Amino acid sequence: MKFSYTLLLAFWVFSGWSQNEVSIYTERQGSDVIVYADNPAVIPMTAEIKLNLTNMKTDFGGDEGLFVIPQKAERHQLLSAKATRQVGKIGLGLESIIYIGDVLNQSETEHIYELPFASGMTYQISQGYNGRFSHKGVNAIDFAMDVGEKVYAARGGIVYRVVQKNSKSCQHSSCQEYNNYIMIYHDDGTFSEYSHLKYNGADVKVGDRVKTGDLIGFSGNTGWSSGPHLHFVVYKYDQKGNRQSLKTKFRTKDQGDTILQEQGSYTKE
């Protein structure tokens, strides 16, 4: 049997950003073509693959799909394709988009979060879900915390991203790039993000596995902010890489497990 093999196209782009670059590449094994991925990141990534096949058939029977790449994976096989004829030209064109996290994990389990501050403390919600200043269309919460107050993990997970180099702030969206924040990935595929931390205000690093209630940083007033506070949001990515913020319930001392309301004050047990 004699084949001529053509790799028609191979490139990858990223939805949002990633801590480390995911690599997708092919390898010829006889008349088969194997598609592999390397993922140096500390959390899983998802590859959306679209193929242009010439006289080839994939092991999953289609020409596009979503494939989860485990964290720290090297040479992880995504798919393979076989020739459908014994002689002649075969080819595999490949396009991919990389989404952060495991977007195939769409579990709807309701998790009760701990308030992200010290036990016995009480804070007011200065801006709630879909708030008028900077939360329009976003399920995020602002806790009215002064600069330098301790911030604790509301839920355990893996620290995916830490930014703490910024000191600038203003009341305009143009300052959003100056947010200091910590981003934590959870086992159900969701993320939690703690924003406006003070300069050098992180007490964790990328790759740390934190437990609920661990100290992770210190509140501040960086980025797009009208004053000192802690911005907290939980979100997931759908199967097209679109970010969806989620309403969450918190465990409180006096109101039980509840959704926090703007201007309400809540105490941690």
Q: What is the predicted role of each segment?
A:
Residues Q127, R161, H196-Y199, N221, ...:
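A residue-level detector for short acidic-glycine micro-motifs
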Residues V151-R161, D203-S219:
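Short, well-structured beta-strand-loop connectors
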Residues M1-V22, A37:
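Bacterial Sec-dependent N-terminal signal peptides
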Residues Q19-A73:
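Cationic-aromatic interfacial patches
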Residues A154-Y199, D203, P228:
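Zn2+-dependent peptidoglycan hydrolase active-site motif and core
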Residues V68-P70, R75-Y178:
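Surface-exposed, glycine-biased beta-strand/turn segments
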Residues H111-A118, S126, H172, A202-K211, ...:
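Acidic, glycine-rich catalytic/binding loops that coordinate metals and/or anionic ligands
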Residues L215, S225-G227, G241-Q244:
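C-terminal soluble interaction/assembly domains
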